[in-house]
Amino acid sequence: MAKAVTVKIKLVSTADTGYFYVTKKNSRTQTDKLSFKKYDPVARKHVEFKEAKIK
């Protein structure tokens, strides 16, 4: 079997609330770490989410 191109990643809130999103990315085309501004329902505002590995 071939190695999977898409990998699951976790987007962790930088507001230190512990909230995270799980998404996937193409590891061949997106080699750098992802970072998005998304809504954090615990902080109740839009904050930056940074990529982390799923353990």
From Swiss-Prot:
SUPFAM superfamilies xref list: Zn-binding ribosomal proteins (SSF57829)
Source species, domain of life: Bacteria
GO MF annotation terms: structural constituent of ribosome
This protein's GO CC annotations: cytosolic large ribosomal subunit
Sorted UniProt keywords: Ribonucleoprotein, Ribosomal protein
GO-annotated biological processes: translation
Presence of keyword Transmembrane: no
Gene that specifies this protein: rpmG
Name the record gives this protein: Large ribosomal subunit protein bL33
Family: Belongs to the bacterial ribosomal protein bL33 family.
Entry keyword Ribonucleoprotein: yes
